[in-house]
């Protein structure tokens, strides 16, 4: 079994970093449609996410902005990946992680693959379901904090988001260790 792991929200200034771990139950027929979540439309991501969730074992883990501020985004991303894999509770022959750093994971074999979210099906799948999951969370936060445009900016440091911070102030879910304005 091969497990793919990826994270989303690393460059955001609001909310958690979120990771997903994915193991396909069998080889699904939609693998040729997978790609890095950043290259797919919202509609395509949501469509593929539903297919992935039906055809894979998966787990999510998120690390809050408070912990990000304490341990930094790099360590928080690795921790989210580690926890997502542990939550799967399935032993894999090979764990493939997007990026160049390896989280603390007990596995027979583990490799970090730069641009893995564009090359490895399991990492592509993790990228997609993680992005859809975090985007849904941002839509929910937008209902609570409508002045910050989270439904649109998804917590990223857009001009509108930074202008909202200048006008309305920093929220408890903003990452204080990041350049906010």
UniProtKB/Swiss-Prot annotation:
Which InterPro entries does its entry note? RNase_HII, RNase_HII/HIII, RNase_HII/HIII_dom, RNaseH-like_sf, RNaseH_sf
Needed co-factor(s): Mn(2+); Mg(2+)
PROSITE patterns assigned to the protein according to its UniProt record, in alphabetical order: RNASE_H_2
Entry's Gene Ontology molecular function annotations: manganese ion binding; RNA binding; RNA-DNA hybrid ribonuclease activity
Q: Which reaction does this enzyme catalyse, per its entry?
A: Endonucleolytic cleavage to 5'-phosphomonoester
Q: What EC numbers are recorded for this enzyme? A: 3.1.26.4
Which compartments does it reside in? Cytoplasm
List ligand-binding residues for a divalent metal cation.
6-7, 98
Any one GO CC term of the record: ribonuclease H2 complex
SUPFAM superfamilies referenced in this protein's UniProt entry, alphabetically: Ribonuclease H-like
Keyword annotations of the record: Cytoplasm, Endonuclease, Hydrolase, Manganese, Metal-binding, Nuclease
Protein name, entry field = Ribonuclease HII
């Amino acid at each position: 079994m091969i497990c793919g792991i990826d994270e989303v929200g690393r460059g955001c200034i609001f909310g958690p970093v979120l990771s997903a771990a994915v193991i396909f139950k069998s080889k699904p027929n939609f693998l040729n449609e997978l790609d890095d979540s950043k290259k797919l439309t919202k509609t395509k991501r949501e469509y593929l996410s539903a297919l992935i969730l039906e055809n894979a074992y998966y787990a999510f883990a998120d690390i809050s902005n408070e912990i990000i501020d304490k341990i930094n985004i790099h360590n928080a991303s690795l921790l989210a990946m580690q926890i997502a894999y542990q939550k799967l509770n399935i032993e894999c022959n090979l764990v493939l992680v997007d990026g160049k750093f390896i989280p603390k994971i007990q596995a027979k074999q583990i490799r970090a693959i730069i641009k893995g979210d564009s090359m490895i099906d399991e990492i592509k799948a993790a990228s997609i379901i993680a992005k859809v999951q975090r985007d849904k969370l941002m839509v929910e936060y937008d209902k609570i904090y409508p002045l910050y445009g989270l439904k649109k900016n998804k917590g990223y440091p857009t001009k509108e988001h930074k202008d909202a911070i200048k006008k309305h102030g920093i929220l408890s879910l903003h990452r204080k260790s990041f350049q906010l304005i």
